[in-house]
Amino acid sequence: MQGHLGKDGVTVEQIADDLQQLVESLLLRLEGEMFTTIQFIDILQSVPEGQAAYEGAWRRWGEQEHASKMVIHGQVIPLNLRRSRLVSWEGYAYGEEDEYAVPAWWKLASPHE
């Protein structure tokens, strides 16, 4: 099923595909048990390659900055995390501040899972 289309026909799935390897790499470096989507986005932006990828992703979507970031925070990054075997979705993180989407809680898989 074709998803939402950005400018020039780019899809959420295409942008997620481009970010997946970086997301997986960052997940392997995380410590702790749980994090929210916005916490992960903050981590993503804390490294130069992540900052460049984040900016490239919302710009590639092609709408105004706020609308494009809504797609990245609410669809692309959650899709990356759902695709990963390194984390599981644990529910919405109501009360967590993210001006672009309702963040979720994610649990890191134990090394034996």
Question: What spans do the regions from the language model cover?
Answer:
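Phospho-regulated, low-complexity intrinsically disordered regions of nuclear gene-regulatory
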Residues: 2-26, 38, 43-113
